[in-house]
Every structure is written in structure tokens, then in C-alpha cells.
From Swiss-Prot:
Source species of the chain: Streptococcus sanguinis (strain SK36)
Gene3D superfamilies associated with the record: HUPs (3.40.50.620)
Entry keyword annotation includes Cytoplasm: yes
GO terms for biological process, alphabetical: tRNA modification
CDD domains cross-referenced by the UniProt entry: TilS_N (cd01992)
Broad class of the protein's primary localization: cytoplasm
EC identifiers of the protein: 6.3.4.19
Name of protein: tRNA(Ile)-lysidine synthase
UniProt cross-references to InterPro entries, sorted A to Z: Lysidine-tRNA-synth_C, Rossmann-like_a/b/a_fold, TilS/TtcA_N, tRNA_Ile_lys_synt, tRNA_Ile_lys_synt_N
MF-aspect GO terms: ATP binding; tRNA(Ile)-lysidine synthase activity
Database matches in SMART domains: TilS_C (SM00977)
Physiological role: Ligates lysine onto the cytidine present at position 34 of the AUA codon-specific tRNA(Ile) that contains the anticodon CAU, in an ATP-dependent manner. Cytidine is converted to lysidine, thus changing the amino acid specificity of the tRNA from methionine to isoleucine.
NCBIfam families assigned: lysidine_TilS_C, lysidine_TilS_N
């Protein structure tokens, strides 16, 4: 009965429509052996080529024999099998990471576009309950997705609507560690959920429905806000606080290596809601950069700090510095050439800003820090602004301001022009 229902579900959902080479994760337990059997008998209708991937965790004496048996089964079925053995200090997380790294490698090397796992409805209920116990955010209580991106293709979980009780008792290997309550998932499966089902026999289904409802809520809100430019500060501020929170959570999903604690999330949200111009270092080599118009989270650059450098430019010479081409007294050809009046009698110093810098504007010296604030110059522009200096006095801050000193040189007989052209950085 399950075979017909499975095939019907796969054809309705079209999980395999875009896949021809499919890799099945097989542990040897009832769940994965059932999945293997279902895909074998549905192979022709689904138009897929199958292969098996198996990881021997080396934690039980019988695991080597089980691996050999799976290799034999694969040969009998005429299906390729890829195996690997775990080594190192064992933990649930380490083993999981090893498995999926191995699966991804096999997919890439064998050109498989789908990895299929045997997670079922009971696993889904356990996952939702476990995340609830650990205090996960609401969006993460949606449980496992039936299809999601993975490695060079997709990870497909076709059994999420089937219960373990639906599976026939076919040949499989029983993992004795599943009955040991050393791990949280085993305690949930063997102790917590059975007790709660005494109060509500439909408790597992209730957990699954909760997960599905949360997933639908997440999908609906994402759809309604899909056209918002979240990195636009004005757009972000126009939203009510609850929508701001949702948008930021959605935005953070783009950074797989960045897992903020609840406290860190609140700090970032507060910065976006209140700070005007700000840079905030986050964990995992990420930083938040915000100016008056936009914000972004990005990887911290490990390039050499160009701000420690300065360079001398002599008359009738050309040089490149800070993603610009500078020509002292020799005209440049091209579009968008900037011009600054300078003296031809002494060399120019090109550098980045320093603490305490000031520039003469309208007869008064003004600190660069205050100038940047008044002009609402973004943090990025502040750090990349090139200072043009002559005789230890600032003539210009590129793209920001030109000093009275440079303007006065326009009518000086000993003046010339510094030509500036942007180059690709």
C-alpha cells in the first residue's frame, strides 16, 4: 500500500522532476532501507538513476558487518554504493558533519544532483520538540523542509508525511544505540514523547502541524515583504518594530556562518533602530556597517590595511593610490576627471585620514570628524577618503571637500593642477 501512496506523492510533488542522478543516504536501519526499496521500485516511473551512500561510524562491533552486507545488497540491486568510515572523537554533531561532508563530496564527484534521506513524520515531531526544548526562535520550529538546497543540488526528504508505523518490516539492521538514552533525541523518542502521548495520543501530529503552520507563516511574511529593500535604512525605519524584527531575522538567514545569540540579535536590532553612523563587529569574522542611507552585514576584509600607507607624488609624475590615478601637472584623458589646484614648487603627499586632521573651509579650520558628520558621509567613504596634502596642510579630501588653500592657488602664478581619475578597485 505504501508503495502506491509513495509514488503518487512523489509524482504530485514533483520532487525528482529536475533530477536524474539521485544519491540515497542509507544507514541500514528500517527507515533508510524502506526508502531504498521505495525508490528502487519507483525508479522507472520517476526516471532516476540511483546510488547509495553509507557511513560506517565505527561505534558498534557489528558496524563493519553491516557495511559489508549493504555492499552486497547494492550489488544485488545493481546500484552503485559509496562508503566511508568515521574517525576521530565521536559526537552527534561531529558524526553528522562528517556524514553530510561525505554526501556532498560524492554528489560533486559523481554529478548527483539530489541527496535523499529517510527522515519521516516521527522524526519531524522529534525535531520540532527538540528545538522547542532548546529555546529556538519561532521560525526554527518549522522543522525540516521536504526540499532544500544542498551541496551541488538539493536535499530531499520524501518520507516526511509518512509515519514509521507505515513502514513494512523488511530486512534491516537494528542500531542498539537507538535505545540508549545518552543523547537528547533518544530521550525525546524513548521517554518524553511517549509520556506526552499518554495525555494526548495525537501529540506528535500536533507538533508536526505546528511546524507546518509556522513554515506557512514564514513563507507568507517572506512573500509579503519580498520587494522591500531591507538594507535601505529609510525603508527599514518605515516598518513597525515587529516587521523590523522579522526582516532582520530573514536578512540574517543569508549568512550561514553567523549564528547570533538572542542578546546579540537585540543589540544589532537596536543599532539599526537608533544609531546613525556605526560599525559593529559581530562574531565569526562578520561586521555590521551602517551609515545614513544603508546598512549591510559582511565578512571582515583580511586585506592589508592601506590606511597605514602614504605616498609622495612629485611634479610631472603620475601615480596610483587608493583606487585613483593621480597626475601632478600632466592632463589626463577620459571622463569624470577631477581637478585640484596645487603648487608646483613642492611635492604632494597622498594618504588616508588620521586622527586630528582638519581642513581650512570658509576661513575656519574644521575637524574632519565633524565635517564627515555634518555632510553625513558614510563610514565606508570616511575610511576610503584620500587626503591630498602639501607643505603639511590639507588641500582636499577627495570627493568630500576642497580647502581654501587650494582655491587660493587658482590665481597663483606657481600653481598647477592635480588631475584625478577613478580606477577599478
Amino acid at each position: 500500500m505504501i508503495k502506491q501512496e509513495f509514488l503518487k506523492k512523489m509524482q504530485e510533488k514533483k520532487y525528482f522532476q529536475d533530477h536524474r542522478k539521485v544519491l540515497i543516504a542509507v544507514s541500514g536501519g528500517l527507515d533508510s532501507m524502506t526508502l531504498l526499496q521505495l525508490l528502487i521500485v519507483s525508479q522507472k516511473e520517476l526516471a532516476i538513476e540511483l546510488a547509495i551512500a553509507h557511513v560506517n561510524h565505527k561505534q558498534r562491533p557489528e558496524s563493519d558487518q553491516e557495511e559489508k552486507a549493504l555492499v552486497k545488497i547494492a550489488e544485488q540491486l545493481g546500484v552503485k554504493i559509496f562508503t566511508s568510515s568515521f574517525s576521530g572523537n565521536f559526537s552527534e554533531n561531529a558524526a553528522r558533519q562528517f556524514r553530510y561532508d561525505f554526501f556532498g563530496k560524492v554528489m560533486q564527484e559523481g554529478h548527483y544532483t539530489a541527496l535523499v534521506t529517510a527522515h519521516h513524520a516521527d522524526d519531524q515531531a522529534e525535531t520540532v520538540f527538540m528545538r522547542l526544548l532548546r529555546g529556538a526562535r519561532l521560525r526554527h520550529l518549522s522543522g525540516m523542509k521536504a526540499v532544500q538546497p544542498f551541496a551541488c543540488g538539493e536535499l530531499i526528504r520524501p518520507l516526511l508525511t509518512f509515519h514509521k508505523s507505515d513502514f513494512p518490516d523488511i530486512q534491516h539492521f537494528e542500531d542498539s544505540s537507538n535505545f540508549q538514552n545518552d543523547y537528547l533525541r533518544n530521550r525525546i523518542r524513548n521517554l518524553y514523547l511517549p509520556d506526552l502521548e499518554k495525555e494526548n495520543p495525537q501529540f506528535k501530529d500536533s507538533l508536526r502541524y505546528l511546524g507546518k503552520e509556522i513554515e506557512d507563516w514564514q513563507t507568507a511574511l517572506s512573500h509579503l515583504t519580498r520587494d522591500l529593500d531591507i538594507e535601505n535604512v529609510q525603508v527599514f525605519h518605515q516598518q513597525i518594530p515587529q516587521v523590523q524584527r522579522f526582516l532582520l531575522q530573514n536578512y540574517l538567514e543569508n549568512f550561514s556562518g553567523l549564528n547570533l545569540s538572542k542578546q546579540q540579535f537585540e543589540e544589532v536590532l537596536n543599532i539599526l533602530q537608533t544609531k546613525a553612523n556605526y560599525q559593529h563587529t559581530l562574531k565569526k569574522d562578520y561586521e555590521l556597517v551602517k551609515d545614513y542611507q544603508r546598512f549591510e552585514i559582511r565578512k571582515i576584509s583580511r586585506k592589508p590595511d592601506l590606511k597605514m600607507d602614504s605616498i609622495l607624488l612629485e611634479f610631472e609624475n603620475l601615480i596610483e593610490f587608493g583606487y585613483y590615478r593621480f597626475s601632478f601637472g600632466i592632463p589626463l584623458s577620459g571622463e569624470n576627471i577631477q581637478k585640484i589646484f596645487v603648487s608646483r614648487e613642492t611635492s604632494l603627499t597622498l594618504r588616508f585620514r588620521k586622527e586630528g586632521d582638519s581642513i581650512l573651509l570658509n576661513g575656519h579650520h574644521k575637524k574632519l570628524r565633524r565635517l564627515f558628520i555634518d555632510k553625513k558621509v558614510s563610514f565606508e567613504e570616511r575610511n576610503s577618503s584620500v587626503v591630498v596634502e602639501q607643505n603639511h596642510q590639507i588641500l582636499a579630501i577627495l570627493n568630500i571637500a576642497i580647502s581654501d588653500l587650494s582655491k587660493a592657488l587658482k590665481s597663483d602664478i606657481m600653481s598647477t593642477v592635480l588631475y584625478i581619475q577613478k580606477i577599478d578597485g
